[in-house]
Amino acid sequence: RAGLGSTGPARFRWHVLGPADDIGAVGQGGEGEAVATDALEPLRELTVEALVADELLARRRAEHRSLPLMVVRAETDMAATAHELGTGAAVANLDLGFANLVAASARLGVGAQVLAVVLDYTLEDLTGDPVAYRDGMIALMERITRGMAKAGLARPIFLAAFDCGTQTVTRGPGLEGQWELSWNHGDHRLVFAAPSYAFRVDDTGR
């Protein structure tokens, strides 16, 4: 679900960017390996995160503030559990995404800062165990944090929507595991930004 995008470009097309690898904001989708690059390019399609970046820029312009460059990248794969997600292709490609961000910022002579890492993995988890889901997500956050540290980036804020399922899926290990994760997420900064029922949702929970 996280790899879906709507048609671009962004309103601030030269400020909402992705690595210049001809993949765009949606990432590899677990189908290949990301490539190293120190260049950036405008996005052809807009993920949820790209739309958020575009809105943040619009608000900064309304306040007559400077407009930074915002780099957006989603990475997904076919992991069946949260534990698998933390050891699979998506997180490996995310590591290279962080390295590309640092390389691009160095080329431009500016600093790199990660505003947030968005976690979007609930209905996909097939463990059947809410506690196993929680433990897998904690391990995933630890894996991402360590990867960012290797790239010289600070510990991130993790954002997630509190997934409430769909009209037909109202129970599940991931859905119930969110409650476990909300009160026990280790020493990571995890913020549930909003419940999914606050938004219009399609039949796939998107």
Q: Where do the protein language model's features map onto the residues?
A:
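Cell-envelope and extracellular/periplasmic
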Residues: R1-R206
